[in-house]
Design a protein with these regions (language model features):
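Hydrophobic scaffolds flanking metal-cofactor catalytic centers in soluble metalloenzymes
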Residues: 2-185
Length: 185
């Protein structure tokens, strides 16, 4: 039996990031760093980090996001959900970097071509930010279809992802749990 995991489907055009959107992102990063500096206890802002998925679950989640192409990233716009909590973690993890270097760290990772109107880090191959630079929301979020899969992951040995929205449908290859990944979620 093949389990079907249904996810949304993004259908947007890729474009070079418009200057005004990049400028808005830079202003947002500056504000987030200022908010961090104004915090009484910046260490208390750091959120617990969501562990990266492993095993068959990681395979299915990666295929789900790739098949969807990042519908959930659309809301990231010019802020990428980054705020003073994200900056607190980034500052803690990179104590040798000053504010300008952190802003440069982000700007250097902009997608050369991002989906129109979506997060500026939402490139053709997914997020151009590594997990340590992403907002915790981005590391922790899964759409309903993927969240439902995670709840029943141990019962699924064969899965196919179906991304559908407004008459568009994309399917992944059938994913099969290997003996090596058996027992891993």
């Amino acid at each position: 039996v093949i389990g079907v995991v249904t996810v949304p489907a993004l259908n947007e055009t890729l474009e070079a990031p418009p200057r005004d959107r990049v400028r808005a992102l830079k202003q947002h990063l500056v504000r987030s760093l200022r908010d961090l500096r104004a915090a009484r206890r910046p260490d208390k802002l750091i959120q617990r980090t969501t562990p990266e998925p492993t095993g068959f679950a990681a395979t299915v989640l990666a295929a789900g996001c790739a098949t969807c192409q990042g519908h959930c990233c659309k809301g990231g716009g010019e802020h990428a959900y980054i705020d003073e909590r994200t900056m607190a973690r980034v500052r803690r993890d990179n104590p040798d970097l000053d504010a300008r270097a952190i802003i440069r760290l982000y700007l250097e990772r902009l997608a050369p071509r991002s989906y129109q109107g979506s997060c500026l880090f939402h490139g053709e191959a997914g997020c151009t930010l590594g997990r340590p630079l992403r907002a915790e929301l981005c590391n922790a979020y899964y759409c309903n279809g993927l969240r439902d899969f995670l709840i029943r992951a141990e019962n699924s040995d064969r899965v196919q992802i179906v991304a559908a929205r407004n008459g568009i449908e994309r399917r992944s290859a059938v994913l099969t749990r290997t003996e090596k990944s058996r027992g891993l979620k």
